[in-house]
Amino acid sequence: MRNMLSESLVDNYKGRNELNIVRIYSGDDGESHFEDVEVEMENRGQVGRISELWCGKGVMFREVEGDYEIDFHNAPRRQLVVNLTGSVDIEIGDGTVRRLGPGSILLAEDTTGRGHISRAVDGEPRSCLFVPLD
């Protein structure tokens, strides 16, 4: 039996030709900014919709406790961050906060400048997958 979150993710992408991810990047002003990015998907019939190949350098898994808060920091490299369990609030310098839940994908590119804050949500631990990109 599928859970409600899985069903809502499937319903969100049903019949669409793109997948939405959140990008965080360093602006010319030295601050991090958010951008919503649509990843184009090609319909391949029975095998589903598939994007172009993104080249990665491996995979890292991470778990954090539900009380973490990491003050302003930069992404250590350009990478995809895929939330597996739990949620994270990401805050940028102007006070904007994005909440990323399970199944959310972040393209982290704010490797310079002030960076962003990451904090746990509702005391829940979180697990995620890092995919460093070329």
Residue locations for each model-derived region?
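Short histidine-centered beta-strand/loop micro-motifs
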Residues: 49-53, 69-75, 91-92, 98-99, ...
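Short acidic-glycine-tyrosine-enriched beta hairpin
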Residues: 63, 93-111
